[in-house]
A protein has these predicted regions:
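Aromatic-lined carbohydrate-recognition surfaces of secreted/lumenal glycan-active proteins
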Residues: 129-140
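Core dinuclear metal-dependent hydrolase active-site scaffold
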Residues: 121-126
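Charged catalytic cores and adjacent phosphate/nucleic-acid-binding surfaces used
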Residues: 2-31, 35, 39, 43-52, ...
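Divalent metal-dependent hydrolysis catalytic cores, especially in the metallo-beta-lactamase
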Residues: 30, 50-67, 127-129
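Ordered, amphipathic secondary-structure segments that act as subunit-interaction surfaces
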Residues: 114-115
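Substrate-binding cleft of extracellular glycoside hydrolase catalytic domains
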Residues: 89
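Short, well-ordered beta-to-alpha junction loops that form the rim of enzyme active sites
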Residues: 66, 131-133, 196-199
Length: 246
């Protein structure tokens, strides 16, 4: 984390945690990370990811494997082993793109349809965030303002976006231009933006995160804060927050 970035975050009085001595401060959380073998395209061991995330200044990290949900017992063991908040999520592949989902306990056939996914998430009192919304949407070969605007408007009509509580404005594996498209889309739709590294390797960790205005100790508190919109994306390479809404 760049010098001064953490210092810019307002410290809170020490709090009595429910189970572990998590950092008593406004929180930086990486909301998008993958580990092997639950995500076949990752080379990250869960323990290595946690160690590196702590070194990078994270207060928590969410494991969001592809269409695979971590069981609570394994998550609890990792929390205790590292005295670090690990959150269980899942990245669901739908016909309308990838959706970061929190609050569900299993993958159910049919979740590739965003409407069915949203129905299950609602029943589970969970939350959905659109991952890397620039994918297959951003115009690569045209810098014409009119065509760029048309691409944003087309992306905003994605059927899945009527169900999400936020868009991933900063993706650690996305280029500056790709993330700029996501930021503009987020502003157009008046949706708050998250940040996640989308880590698949050690070198991915620590690039960006989501800054939460209140402390979080578990998935339920994470879901509540996402629904309340009390967060914004932070680029940890520059230390600069990303805010698209007034």
């Amino acid at each position: 984390m760049p010098p001064g970035c953490r210092a810019a975050l307002r410290e809170l009085p020490a709090a009595k945690g429910p189970a572990y001595s998590y950092a008593a401060r406004l929180m930086l959380i990486d909301l998008h990370a993958h580990t092997w073998p639950r995500s076949h395209d990752s080379v990250l061991n869960p323990d290595d990811l946690i160690v590196r995330a702590k070194q990078a200044g994270m207060d928590a990290v969410a494991f969001t494997e592809h269409d695979t949900v971590w069981d609570f017992k394994s998550i609890e063991e990792l929390r205790a082993k590292h005295n670090f908040l690990v959150l269980a999520g899942v990245e669901i592949s739908t016909d309308d793109g990838h959706i970061l989902t929190f609050g569900i306990d299993k993958y159910v056939f049919g979740m590739h349809r965003s409407r069915e996914l949203a129905s299950y998430v609602e029943k589970s009192e969970g939350v959905m965030v659109a991952a890397h919304p620039y994918r297959r949407q951003m115009p690569w070969f045209s810098r014409n303002d009119e065509e760029y605007q048309a691409a944003l408007e087309k992306a905003s009509r994605n059927p899945a976006y009527q169900y999400v509580q936020g868009l991933e404005e900063l993706n650690g594996r996305g280029s500056d231009k790709e993330n700029e498209f996501s930021r503009r889309l987020s502003a157009m739709m008046d949706l708050p933006g998250t940040g996640g590294t989308d880590s698949h390797a050690i070198s991915d960790i620590g690039k960006c995160a989501t800054y939460f205005e209140r402390e979080i100790h578990d998935e339920r508190e994470l879901i509540a804060e996402l629904k309340a919109g009390r967060f914004y994306a932070v680029d940890l390479r520059t230390g600069k927050p990303v805010a698209t809404r007034a």
